[in-house]
Amino acid sequence: MSKEIFIGIDGGGTKTSTVAVDSNGQELARHTSPCSNYHSVGEDLAKAAINEGIKYVIRKVKETITDDDNKEVTVGSICLGMSGVDREKDKLLVKSWVTELLGESINYSIHNDAIVALSSGTQGKLFGVVIICGTGCISLGFNREGVSGRSGGWGPLLGDYGSGYQIGYDILRHVLKAKDQVGPKTSLTQVLLEKLQLTKEEDLISWAYDPKTQSWQKFAQLSPLAFEQAQLGDEISNLILVDAANALYDLINSVIKKLGLDKEEKFPLVYTGGNIERKGILSDLLSKKIMENYPNAEILNTTCDPSMGAALLALNSKK
């Protein structure tokens, strides 16, 4: 009798994590391969990264089977959570890679990374709301009927208010307003210049517009300064985080209303992303506003990584 496994894949912008679990959800094997976002690395490298992970975990599971006469492994289901895969043609492309390797009959699902993040907090159940606040931000959810809703995720140029990028941008904005004497002084000025190893505010122009380092991440990497200085009593830093909490609440509120979750006796709300999954001023501000308006929300942090969240979705799809 062959051993049945369930595979979850988290295809992020920097790496691809693949996990195999058994029918009880116990982890059997894990592998990390390069980026599988084909918009970033191209189709060939993305396909190779996904195939590498699948082949590795199957091989490792086979190595653990003690029955020398039967080392067969059957993939009961596979679930992929992929960044940059939202359109139908993207999903069909990735599906073709998987079915080429595992066969057309494979039980298969593909979701964007927000859905897998929700599963990481709900142990594989697609019910409730997730708010992701990293470099960008998005809220997504499902009601009991399986209807989905989302808000945000438009990217820094079109929105992402409340995101790490926006917090970093607001730090720069307030530092320069203080320099121009059109806004109050802030302790962010000194710590920002120290972090970037600059001597004066005018140097921020070349830092911000340097074509060699143009990325949303470099703005988001400034966001910890607001957390640190708010903790030390800086009013501007606290204001930035209050604005961020209000923006994140608006995303969550929109999804709750769209899905009618306000009428539920209780629903899970999963926090994930570096800016809110750790306890701190932003998560406290957000939680306070949530509980004032939705006392039926059960605020959760993720209990496993996204690849395990995907594996649990794969497992639950067979139940």
Curated annotation (Swiss-Prot):
Q: Which UniProt keywords apply?
A: ATP-binding, Kinase, Nucleotide-binding, Transferase
Q: Spell out the reaction equation it catalyses.
A: N-acetyl-D-glucosamine + ATP = N-acetyl-D-glucosamine 6-phosphate + ADP + H(+)
Q: Which Pfam family, just one, is annotated for this protein?
A: BcrAD_BadFG
The GO terms describing molecular function are: ATP binding; N-acetylglucosamine kinase activity
| Record-listed substrate binding positions | N37, D113, G153, W154, G155, D160
Binding positions (ATP): T14, T135, A220
Please report any disulfide bonds recorded for this protein chain, giving both cysteine positions: none
Q: What class of enzyme is it?
A: transferase
- List its EC numbers: 2.7.1.59
Query: Entry's InterPro entries?
Result: ATPase_BadF, ATPase_NBD, Euk-type_GlcNAc_Kinase
The annotated subunit structure for this chain is: Homodimer.
What this chain does, per the record? Converts N-acetylglucosamine (GlcNAc), a major component of complex carbohydrates, into GlcNAc 6-phosphate. Also has ManNAc kinase activity.
What protein family does this chain belong to?
Belongs to the eukaryotic-type N-acetylglucosamine kinase family.
Name used for this protein in its record: N-acetyl-D-glucosamine kinase
User: Organism source for this protein?
Assistant: Dictyostelium discoideum
